[in-house]
Regions:
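N-terminal signal-anchor module of multipass membrane proteins
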Residues: 1-55, 61-64
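Alpha-helical transmembrane segments
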Residues: 7-18, 79-93, 120, 178-194, ...
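Membrane-interfacial helix termini and the short, flexible loops that connect transmembrane helices
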Residues: 32-45, 70-77, 97-118, 205-215, ...
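Membrane-interface helix-loop-helix modules in multi-pass inner-membrane proteins
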Residues: 52-127, 131, 137-144, 241-245
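Transmembrane helix-loop-helix
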Residues: 77-92, 217, 221-270, 275-276
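Hydrophobic alpha-helical membrane-insertion segments
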Residues: 122-139, 275-291
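Long hydrophobic alpha-helical segments that form multi-pass transmembrane helix bundles
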Residues: 124-201, 205-211
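Short, membrane-exposed interhelical loops at transmembrane-helix boundaries
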Residues: 299-321
């Protein structure tokens, strides 16, 4: 295994961490106004992600930073050509921080309601756009190799398969509308439904009483649609765009996870339902990266214009230094993440919440008098 392939896999792992963890953060925000009937329930719903949402965003920062360092050509091509979509996602993430942090600053229900709506919108948009973005990476984008000096397109026959053209760069030359196709829109529906169900299961797992039961019932209604739409999109991707038979393996595992989650949810076991849904999303991300390989960005204009893992990678010296750093720090990050979820494993008792008291205090999200949220037992 070359260092470039190793880092392609490591970046996939970082995206797994982000989408599985931030996925339920988005889902909680999406259902906040639907599930929370009053201020007490909305505060309890928000408290489920209170200790974790900002830490979960670190996975995105790390994935972006790793891409910049390990695959600079991939980073520059993607960010320069899809900057509008990525800017909207970034803006939503910033606004969501304001919605969560500023919500309790004023003891006014009108103030809180407005920020709840902001939170909801800033959760829905990225949930859809992430799916559209990853579907574009699988389907292929309007990419050509262009001379940086005069903007002339390099003929496809002159583009080497294992190196970059001197004085030229891969560029997304199509407009924003070329990224909007039935396949990419279905990809947006996939992430939207998966995150909705992920959030509902997390609230069911982390709360008690009527709120937990209503969240579980919501998941039971969402799970069939999420599973069916994901299966349709994944089969479309595999049959039309994947160049590897190996990508069937994560596809089947993802399907098994989502179906198992659906069955566990129907049996009333929200812990196992959430754990299996987590597995389903994780292997859906594995499937996306397996379908992309050996490219990091596929060209819909001509296969010769596709940006491969080898072409996009940094020098081996850079990748070696990054590998040593990752071997030192990544286990610590994983250990801390697991520990933080263990510390705040207690379920949240809705009845113990004072609706007039703002903020997500530690006593609210870490109540030793409540049972812990376990995954299946």
């Amino acid at each position: 295994m070359t260092l470039s392939i190793l880092w392609f896999i490591l970046i996939a792992v970082l995206w797994i961490g982000y989408l599985t963890l931030e996925g339920f953060d988005f889902g909680v925000g999406m259902i906040l106004k639907i599930l929370g009937r009053d201020e007490r329930e909305r505060r309890a719903t928000l408290a489920t992600i209170g200790p974790h949402w900002d830490g979960n965003e670190v996975w995105l920062l790390t994935a972006g930073g790793a891409t910049f360092a390990a695959f600079p050509e991939w980073y520059s091509t993607l960010f320069s050509g899809a900057y509008i979509v990525l800017f909207i996602i970034l803006l939503c993430l910033i606004v969501r921080v304001c919605a969560i942090e500023w919500r309790p600053k004023v003891n006014s229900q009108t103030w809180r309601d407005r920020w709840d709506w902001v939170h909801t919108v800033s959760a829905w948009l990225p949930s859809i756009l992430w799916g559209v973005a990853f579907a574009n990476l699988v389907q292929g984008m309007h990419i050509e190799v262009v001379q940086t000096s005069n903007g002339a397109v390099v003929p496809a026959a002159q583009v080497p398969a294992d190196s970059l053209v001197p004085g030229a760069a891969h560029q997304i030359t199509g407009g924003l509308l070329t990224m909007v196709t039935p396949f990419t829109l279905l990809g947006g529906a996939v992430t939207c439904l998966l995150f909705l169900n992920h959030g509902a299961l997390f609230v069911a797992l982390k709360t008690t009483g009527d709120l937990s039961q209503r969240a579980l019932r919501m998941s039971r209604r969402l799970a069939p649609a999420a599973t069916a739409v994901t299966a349709a999109w994944a089969l479309w991707a595999q049959l039309a765009y994947s160049g590897s038979a190996l990508s069937w393996i994560p596809l089947v595992i993802a399907a098994a996870g989502l179906i198992g989650s659906l069955l566990m949810g129907r049996s009333g076991n929200e812990g196992r339902a959430f754990a299996l849904h987590f597995v389903g999303i994780a292997f859906a991300v594995v499937f996306i990266f397996a379908a992309m390989a050996p490219n990091v960005m596929r060209s819909s204009v001509d296969p010769a214009y596709s940006l491969t893992i080898q072409q996009a990678a940094s020098a081996d010296t850079t990748l070696l230094i990054m590998s040593v750093a990752a071997a030192v720090f990544v286990p610590g990050v994983l250990a801390y993440t697991i520990w933080s979820y263990k510390v705040f494993a207690s379920r949240i008792n809705v009845e113990s919440i004072n609706p007039d008291e703002g903020g997500l205090h530690p006593t609210l999200v870490r109540d030793s008098t409540q049972p812990e949220a376990h995954f299946g037992y």
